[in-house]
Every structure is written in structure tokens, then in C-alpha cells.
UniProtKB/Swiss-Prot annotation:
The lineage of its organism: Bacteria, Bacillati, Actinomycetota, Actinomycetes, Streptosporangiales. Keywords: Coiled coil, Secreted. Belongs to the WXG100 family. CFP-10 subfamily. Pfam families: WXG100 (PF06013). This is ESAT-6-like protein. Residues 12-43 form a coiled coil. The keyword Repressor does not apply.
Length: 104
């Protein structure tokens, strides 16, 4: 017997929404941190300030990679759901055609 597959489209949609909300919250935090860093740097000069800037920039790059990954997961979930629904609809139409032929 072939393995069966079940897809919970509502759960898939909820997961996509949760990921999008999380990414938006993280973007907000990233913007707040950048603003706080800019404010701090406006009153701070010297080698320590420049070292902090370099570390912050690396941290911000990592932050951006996380956001890119979240955006990718969101897009994949959305596209997978769209593809699944289209295939499910096509399969249902095929079943309906066969049923119509059998019913004469």
C-alpha cells in the first residue's frame, strides 16, 4: 500500500502567518537597535567606539541573515500551500470527470 500524505492547510497558513509576524517583530527590534546604536555613537568617539561599530555591523549582518531565512521559510510555506491547493483542485476535477463518465 502506498504511503498516505495529509496536509493541514490551516496549520500551514497559520505557520506562514506566525513566521511573518515573527520576522516583522525581529525587523522592528533590528531597527530599534540600529537607532540606539546611532544615538550612542553620536556621543562616543575613539577606538572603542569604532570596535563597537564593527562588532555591531557583524551582529546586524547575522540579524539580516536570520530575517532572510525567515522570509524564505514564509515564502516556501505560502507557495507550497498554493501548489498543494491547485493540485488538490485538479485532482478533484479529474475525479468529478471520471464520476460523470461513469454515471453516463
Amino acid at each position: 500500500m502506498a504511503p498516505q500524505s495529509a496536509v493541514d492547510r490551516a496549520a500551514m497558513a497559520q505557520a506562514a502567518q506566525d513566521i511573518e509576524q515573527s520576522a516583522n517583530a525581529i525587523r522592528g527590534m533590528q531597527n530599534q537597535l540600529a537607532s540606539a546604536k546611532d544615538q550612542l555613537r553620536s556621543h562616543w568617539e575613539g577606538d572603542a567606539s569604532m570596535a563597537f561599530e564593527a562588532v555591531f555591523n557583524r551582529f546586524n549582518e547575522d540579524f539580516s541573515r536570520v530575517l532572510k531565512a525567515l522570509d524564505g521559510m514564509h515564502e516556501s510555506l505560502v507557495q507550497t500551500r498554493i501548489t498543494y491547493e491547485a493540485r488538490e483542485e485538479a485532482a478533484q476535477q479529474s475525479v468529478n470527470r471520471v464520476q460523470a463518465l461513469l454515471n453516463g
